[in-house]
């Protein structure tokens, strides 16, 4: 009877369980042990945290992408009946396991693409937190999702908000998707001030707790640029129908305007566990212990236009989206290189946009890329961007 009951729980594979999204997803599972179970946990490098998670949540399988950490992981879990694997190929294979119902793609960057494709082909529901997957290969992912009848449920707070606003609106044309942006820690900085900002300053986001890569992307507004591209593929809208509005309080998570002029918005506390839980429970809503929004404290909700002169990455992302093909893949690869350089003090904050723009000019453009083209583009754009860093 126990095993029968266990099988009724949704079995979730978490790719990137040691990151910000992954750890919060485990909090959701912990709050609803009657509904969800962590079937597989994967991490890139943080083996100590992965060991602690495995001991606590007792998954069937754990995978460490960094093969050098395999022996340490295997030894630490030797007293438990948990299968232990290493390497990116193992991550790609684990998503195909029969018992898995849903795959949460919370890996950072381009690395999330191949496991997501494998999970779609295996007809697993996708809780998509790895936005780079749609930025790099949105057209391919959409084609595969349709071919394999695989649902893609957005975990990004903005796209979850739009998704929730569209509930009950089947057949009602969207006039505009309005993505809100906090503006990041440098919203009020002048161009002159932005020349000298440091990684320590950039890593202090005013509203959200996130990993280092996405926090830098938020500070540079590349994160919002990626979300614009992601929205195009998730919601089937044209680039001209996607608008970004800076909303520093992060209370309204995004909005949809319909052709009659009505606007629906989704509001809530800036807590990623809410969109994670909604992706897990969809189409149902389930109770949570998360903080509630107190409207008496929301005395000042403000909105402003983003400044693409100071934050050029947003304009570059729009340009990539309009050009299509492999251009968003080029932008993503260059961005990953420059963010890594910025985090090791190897490039200035504004210098990141310069390198991305030059990489867009120099990398080979492919109008209708296949998967192999994305792989080649990613490698070429990374090489070009690395050479451009002073």
UniProtKB/Swiss-Prot annotation:
NADPH binds at residues 18-21, 130, 132, 211. Pathway: Isoprenoid biosynthesis; isopentenyl diphosphate biosynthesis via DXP pathway; isopentenyl diphosphate from 1-deoxy-D-xylulose 5-phosphate: step 1/6. Keywords: Isoprene biosynthesis, Manganese, Metal-binding, NADP, Oxidoreductase. Gene3D superfamilies: 1.10.1740.10, NAD(P)-binding Rossmann-like Domain. 1-deoxy-D-xylulose 5-phosphate binds at residues 131, 157-158, 182, 205, 218, 223-224, 227. It catalyses: 2-C-methyl-D-erythritol 4-phosphate + NADP(+) = 1-deoxy-D-xylulose 5-phosphate + NADPH + H(+). Its cofactor is Mg(2+); Mn(2+). GO terms for molecular function: 1-deoxy-D-xylulose-5-phosphate reductoisomerase activity; manganese ion binding; NADPH binding. Its EC number is 1.1.1.267. Transmembrane segments: none annotated. InterPro entries: DXP_reductoisomerase, DXP_reductoisomerase_C, DXP_reductoisomerase_N, DXPR_C, DXPR_C_sf, NAD(P)-bd_dom_sf. Mn(2+) binds at residues 156, 158, 227. It comes from the Bacteria. Coiled coil: none annotated. One of its GO terms (biological process) is isopentenyl diphosphate biosynthetic process, methylerythritol 4-phosphate pathway involved in terpenoid biosynthetic process. The keyword Manganese applies. Belongs to the DXR family. NCBIfam families: Dxr, PRK12464.1. Catalyzes the NADPH-dependent rearrangement and reduction of 1-deoxy-D-xylulose-5-phosphate (DXP) to 2-C-methyl-D-erythritol 4-phosphate (MEP). This is 1-deoxy-D-xylulose 5-phosphate reductoisomerase. The lineage of its organism: Bacteria, Pseudomonadati, Bacteroidota, Bacteroidia, Bacteroidales.
């Amino acid at each position: 009877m126990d095993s029968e009951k266990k099988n009724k729980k949704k079995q979730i594979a978490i790719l990137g369980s040691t990151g910000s999204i992954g750890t919060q997803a485990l909090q959701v599972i912990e709050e609803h042990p009657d509904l969800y179970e962590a079937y597989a946990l994967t991490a890139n490098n943080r083996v100590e945290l992965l060991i602690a998670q495995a001991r606590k949540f007792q998954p069937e399988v754990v995978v460490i992408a960094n093969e050098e950490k395999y022996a340490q992981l295997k030894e630490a879990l030797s007293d438990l009946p948990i299968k232990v694997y290493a390497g990116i190929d193992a991550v790609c294979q684990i998503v195909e396991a029969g018992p898995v119902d849903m795959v949460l793609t919370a890996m950072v960057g381009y690395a999330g693409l191949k496991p997501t494709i494998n999970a779609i082909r295996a007809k697993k529901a996708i809780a998509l937190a790895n936005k780079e997957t749609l930025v790099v290969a949105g057209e391919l992912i959409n084609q595969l999702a349709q071919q394999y009848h695989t649902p893609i449920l957005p975990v990004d707070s903005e796209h979850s908000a739009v998704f929730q606003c569209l509930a009950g609106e089947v057949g009602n044309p969207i006039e505009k998707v309005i993505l809100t942006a906090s503006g990041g820690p440098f919203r009020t900085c002048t161009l002159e001030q932005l020349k000298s900002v440091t990684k320590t300053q950039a890593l202090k986001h005013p509203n959200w707790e996130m990993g280092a890569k996405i926090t830098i992307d938020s500070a540079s507004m590349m994160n919002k640029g990626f979300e614009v591209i992601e929205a195009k593929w998730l919601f089937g809208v044209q680039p001209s129908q996607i608008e970004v509005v800076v909303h520093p309080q992060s209370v309204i998570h995004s909005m949809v305007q319909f052709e009659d002029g009505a606007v629906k918005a989704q509001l809530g506390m800036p807590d990623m566990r809410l969109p994670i839980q909604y992706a897990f429970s969809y189409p149902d809503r389930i109770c949570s212990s998360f903080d509630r929004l107190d409207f008496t404290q929301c005395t000042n909700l403000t909105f402003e236009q983003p400044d693409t002169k100071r934050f050029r990455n947003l304009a570059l992302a729009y340009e990539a989206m309009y050009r299509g093909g492999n251009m968003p893949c080029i932008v993503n690869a260059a961005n990953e290189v420059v963010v890594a350089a910025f985090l090791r003090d190897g490039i200035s904050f504004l210098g990141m946009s310069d390198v991305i723009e030059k990489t867009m000019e120099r990398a080979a453009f492919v109008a209708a890329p296949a998967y192999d083209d994305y792989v080649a583009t990613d490698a070429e754009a990374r090489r070009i961007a690395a050479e451009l860093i002073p």
